[in-house]
Every structure is written in C-alpha cells, then in structure tokens.
C-alpha cells in the first residue's frame, strides 16, 4: 500500500504518541528533542518522501556505479585542478603550485632503496623488539593459532562487509532507487543483567518497505530454542517442539501502539495485560492502541531515532529496540532485497562449558543431582551420559535433567 494511505495509527506530533488524527503536522522530519539522545517523533514514509523530493538531480538517487574517468587527458585535467586549488589556498602562482606538486608529491615520498617490503622484518635487524615480533609471527604461522582479540576483529569485519555491494541474481529482487534503510539495534533480553542496558545483541539493516513481521522473524533469541520438559528417564527422546513452534505470540511497541503478531490462529494478544494495567486506576499513560504487525511496514511508523522501544516474545522475553539511523540506499549497499533484514553486527557470546571436562559446551542442566557438586549443574552430552547412566542406558540415582540451549549457539 502506498505510503500515507494506510489506515491505522498515525503521528499526532504531541508527546510522540501515535493517535488517530488527520495529518501528521510537523512530524515529517526528525527534530532533536535532546542532543545526542533521541529525536522527536516523525513519520518514516513522509520523511522519505521529503528526502526524495529534495534530491531531484540526475544521479542523486541512482544505484548505478559512478563511471570511472577514462577520457584522454583526464589525469592532466585533475592535476590542473589540484594546482589551482593549491594556488588559491596558499595564495601563490600556478607555477609555484606545480613545482610544489613535483617536489612534494607522493611519488617523492619513497625510500632510497627499492624493493623493500615494509611488512617484512629484515633478517639483519639489531632491534630486540623486532626480533621478538618476528619470532611471534613465525610461531603463529607454524601453529596456525589466532589470538582471541584477532578472531573477534576478523569476526566483526566479516559481519559488516560480507554483503557490501552485493547485487541480486534476479533483477526483480533489486532494491528500488530512493528506498529507505533503517539501522536497528536489538539489545539483550532484560534477564541478561550484565549487558541489558548498553550492549546491542544484534544490529540489523531493514528496508522501509519491509513489514514488521520480517524483522520479527529475523531476530534470533535463545529463548525461542528452549525445550520444555524433563528428560532424565528418556534422554534419547527427540523433542517434538521448541518454544518458537509452541508460543508464536509477539509484539513490537512503537510510540503508543502495540503491533501484535496475529499471523497464526494460536497467537494471543500479549499487549492486552499491559493495556488493562495502564488503564486501571488512571495511571496517566494515556490510551494505547493495538494493530496487527503483519499489516504495517516501517514506512507506516512514527518513530524517534535513538529512543528505546520494545520487542516482546515468548510471553515475557523482552528486548529493548533502538532505531539509530535512517538513510537512503546507496550503490555500495547490499542491493539484494531478499537478504534484508541484513545482520551486520552480532555480539560474541561466551559459552558455558561442561562442569566435568571443561572443554565442550553444556547440553544438559540437572537439579537435585546427587552426582553433581552444585545445583544446578551443567554437562556436555558425553559427560552427562557417562556420569548418570550405565552401559545399557539405565538411569543411576535420582536427578532431574533438562535440555540446555547455550546462548553461544548463535556464535
């Protein structure tokens, strides 16, 4: 549906709440309420229209690669322009500027000895620090080990650059010129007290024309993979369902409106309890609205950049969501629509190791376990079975065993 033509919550421009009024007033562009914190509420689609209306020049919105200067004499023309700029800045003649370029050019900043690679440590060095560095690099190449800091830097770089400039094989999947891209930070669930307020769990790029359900389906959370039930008597039994299959309800909260996922018959309105609580005893929160998540795109929303919003799923697993940036698509961006929402950052999580071997990631957690030194206690699959069952698979002792899904699963 075209932007601005959809019925439902719209910006009122008052208090940032989406109230059903005609027109969006002065909230079509982000105005900063507090510096470096968040903007005032604005309508995403209207803001995009204003942006596209200003960029009417040839090539302003084009996603084609800029042509390389391949005309004869273009290099000489560039040199002339550089000389003119230097002459203007230094208030000197063109001849003096040309002489400065010839004497102080980059091609003059070379060592006297040719053929030396600055990345290679020479053999006959007398510096102790270079000798230590050389032995360290040789040891790394021999053992093929990479320190943790280097691994994380490589991981972050690959996440950010893996889709840069990627174009679709099918032209129908090409992003349209003038499309909006929003940067969304999904923070840790509130139960992660260490990181819940300041560490983004995931950072994604979403298109303004994408539905809220597409972002909802792309958010990975360990609570969706939990397996219900106690399996001490049947450890080999394969679970029939995970939490994501059983509890499909979820909602986003943006500017006074709860967008509930109602795509499936078993979905419930998780926001109803919050709305009833806010309306009881006149708590002063005003009147909230509800809408169907699958009926709205990001272009239909009123948002504040830098403002904390909410994503709730699995009944009570809550993630703070912050939209940090909004911009037009560029030719260097990933232009394949099918890859969005595009994950560009993901926090590296420590995995919980088995209490026995201290090597493998935990797969089981036990309670009231006479064989364990602590309660609860975590085990990998091998140690769990060796400690709690005999060679024929019979249970030894009394304990309760539950499948454990480690948050580091998404590493």
Curated annotation (Swiss-Prot):
Organism, as annotated: Homo sapiens (Human)
Keywords: DNA-binding, Nucleus, Transcription, Transcription regulation
A GO molecular-function annotation: DNA binding
Classification of source organism: Eukaryota, Metazoa, Chordata, Craniata, Vertebrata
Record bears the keyword Transcription: yes
GO annotation, cellular component aspect: nuclear body; nucleolus; nucleoplasm; nucleus; snRNA-activating protein complex
Physiological role: Part of the SNAPc complex required for the transcription of both RNA polymerase II and III small-nuclear RNA genes. Binds to the proximal sequence element (PSE), a non-TATA-box basal promoter element common to these 2 types of genes. Recruits TBP and BRF2 to the U6 snRNA TATA box.
Region (Disordered): 1-22, 63-82
Subunit structure: Part of the SNAPc complex composed of 5 subunits: SNAPC1, SNAPC2, SNAPC3, SNAPC4 and SNAPC5. SNAPC3 interacts with SNAPC1.
Protein name: snRNA-activating protein complex subunit 3
Annotated compartments: Nucleus
Main location: nucleus
Keyword Transcription regulation tagged: yes
